[in-house]
Curated annotation (Swiss-Prot):
It comes from Aliivibrio salmonicida (strain LFI1238) (Vibrio salmonicida (strain LFI1238)). Specifically catalyzes the cleavage of the D-lactyl ether substituent of MurNAc 6-phosphate, producing GlcNAc 6-phosphate and D-lactate. Together with AnmK, is also required for the utilization of anhydro-N-acetylmuramic acid (anhMurNAc) either imported from the medium or derived from its own cell wall murein, and thus plays a role in cell wall recycling. The active site is at 85 (proton donor), 116. Belongs to the GCKR-like family. MurNAc-6-P etherase subfamily. It catalyses: N-acetyl-D-muramate 6-phosphate + H2O = N-acetyl-D-glucosamine 6-phosphate + (R)-lactate. Homodimer. Its EC number is 4.2.1.126. Pathway: Amino-sugar metabolism; 1,6-anhydro-N-acetylmuramate degradation; Amino-sugar metabolism; N-acetylmuramate degradation; Cell wall biogenesis; peptidoglycan recycling. GO terms for biological process: 1,6-anhydro-N-acetyl-beta-muramic acid catabolic process; amino sugar catabolic process; N-acetylmuramic acid catabolic process; peptidoglycan turnover. This is N-acetylmuramic acid 6-phosphate etherase. A lyase-type mechanism (elimination/hydration) is suggested for the cleavage of the lactyl ether bond of MurNAc 6-phosphate, with the formation of an alpha,beta-unsaturated aldehyde intermediate with (E)-stereochemistry, followed by the syn addition of water to give product.
Amino acid sequence: MKIDLTTLVTESRNQASEQIDVLSTVEMLTVINKEDQKVALAVEAILPQIAEVVDAIAVAFQCGGRLIYIGAGTSGRLGILDASECPPTYGSNPDLVVGLIAGGHKAILKAVENAEDNRELGASDLQDLGLNEKDVLVGIAASGRTPYVLGAMAYAKSVGATVATLSCNPNSPMTELADINMTPVVGPEIVTGSSRMKAGTAQKLVLNMLTTGAMIRTGKVFGNLMVDVEATNAKLVQRQKNIVIEATGCSETEAAESLSQCNNHCKTAILIVLSGLDAKSATDKLTEYNGFIRDALANS
C-alpha cells in the first residue's frame, strides 16, 4: 500500500539544509541551531490549547483519573520519559501518568517492525490498561497519521475519555478524533523526515508543560518548589531539607527535625514549621485541603 507523505510538513525538504553535507562542522551545527530556535516559537503559538489540556488533566487527577500518553517510536519514548519522571519529582503514584509505546517495552530500545501500523493494537493496549471516562489520553505522533495512535484515540473516544493530540502536521487524521488539538508546526526537518529532531523537541517541551502544569494545579508545587519530592537517594534527602529551608526560612537543623517528625514528607514538614502544628495535625490539615499548602496554612 502506497502512503502519500508529500502533504506532510514533517516530510518536506528544508531549503536551509539542502547543502548541509558540504558545510564545515560549525556551519552545519549553526544551521541546526537556527532551526531549533523555531521550536519554542511554534510551541508558544499553541499555548491556549496546551492550557486547555493541562486543565483537563488536573480535573482528571482530582476525580480519580489518569493521564495516558500513547505513541510509536520517538513519540512513544518521549511519553514514557515524561511519565517516568513524575513519581520521583512529584511523589505521584506510578499509575497516575502512564506512557505506552507501539510494540511494548522492548520498543523503547529497539524498533519493533510494523507495530505502529497496527490500529487494533492501539485499542487493545488501552483496553489492557482499563482506560475509562475519567482518563485523559494524549495521542503523540509527529505525522498525525500513525495507525497505532489513531486506533487508540478511537477507542478512547468510545469509552468517553478526554482525547488530545500532539502532532506537528496541521489538519492531520488525528485532529478529527480529538477533543483538543496541540499542533506545534515546526516546519521541515534538517534531515528530511527525521522527526526525532525539531518535532521531537517540540513534543518534549509540550509534555513538560502538561505534567508540570497539572502537578502545579493539583498542589504539588509551592512557590516553585517541588514539595512532594520523595527522598530516594542522598541528593534528594538534601534537596528535601533545602526545600523546607527555602519555603520557611528555618535552619537546616529545624528542617531536618521537622522532616523526621513526618516520615520525611516535605510538604508536611513545611506546614509544621510555618503553622506550628504537630505532625498529625499538619497531615490532617493537608488532607482537608487536598494537599495545597497555601490553603492549609490560611486555615490553620
